[in-house]
Amino acid sequence: MDINTAKEALLKRSNAFQERYFTAYGQLVLRVNEETYISSRENLRLSKLTEKDFDLFDINTGDIGRIFSSRDDINAIVFICTEAAVRFSKENQVMRPALDDLAQIIGPDVTVCPDGTARTLLKALRNRRGCFIQGSGIIAVGDTIEEAIAGARILEKSAEAEIYSGKLNGLQYLDPTTAQELHKYYDGSYSKVNQKEKVDFISSGAEEFQLRNRIIDCGKDMSRSELVQGSWGNISLRLNPDTMLITPSGMDYFSIRTEDIVRMNIHDLKYGMQRKPSSEYRLHAALYRRYPECNAIIHTHSNGISAFAAAHAGFRISEPPMDQLIGDMHCSEYRTPGTDELCDSIMEAIEGSHACIIANHGAIFYGNDLDVTLAIANAVESRACNLLGFGQRAEEEEA
């Protein structure tokens, strides 16, 4: 990787901080090669970064250089300072996972470091992909900048859930064994799926080609709307009475190509020699089988709804037309992601509605049209944020 490619990657991925929920100040860092790394200057507003904000450093420079020199598995580092992260880090010494994506991508627990020295951070990052720095914010690391940014946003989301959980009678934490198993699964399986650079294109008609591209566009829109972090969440469309098209597992929404979308039979769940489908394919297929009017499904990991998910709480929707389109948001019982048991739990919770909250996880929405379903997911997320009283700060600052 050369410096221009690295700078382009950081600028491109800085659009993950769209300020729907919070304004993030901080630093994006990427290893260029064995001798250098590129970094934005400290404490800049990440959504406003420009080409002039980056500098090249020797790999041995500063605490960042010492982290890179000590850990060859770390190629990207993200520092973010937000109100929720600072507040949580001042009041706590450790974070327990109440969201399973935190357990998976970051670790079974998260340390609050007393300082930001390389020695302290390296200790906290042992077998972890992130931590808090007391009174300063978040550091997240990864093999790629996409993974590090996703980790930082998941830590921020979890800090928000901790702070606002008092309005929801507290959080329901994952037990330590479950959290450890989820992290082990991510390291051993999820993070390694669909690593093949390209797959062969499956012959399809014009309608299927169009639907595949609609899924891709929807994924990018979900990311821009901050309804998901990184590769989390999933999307599907009904192709015909017996077949669905679904997003692949573990792939960033901005890297998915037309041929990466997986065609699957909703009855026998066969998909042949394609990408591995989203781990929630059983749930999507079950919804298509049960509800003939279901033509589109979206699964999100958005901040507001995630706070309710972490508390095993639902909420009422009484405002028209949303009350008719969705119904109340009930919360399912917690079950391990990607299992038949999770599918059964969600199918029970979604009965009589077109959406539900998934305990310790996120939310699922279905409808007749993909664009309408995405609009509903955005509207319900805004409703969750309003009920909690957060997510308006960035808009107020711009006003």
Residues of each region from the PLM?
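Glycine-rich flexible loops
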Residues: 1-399
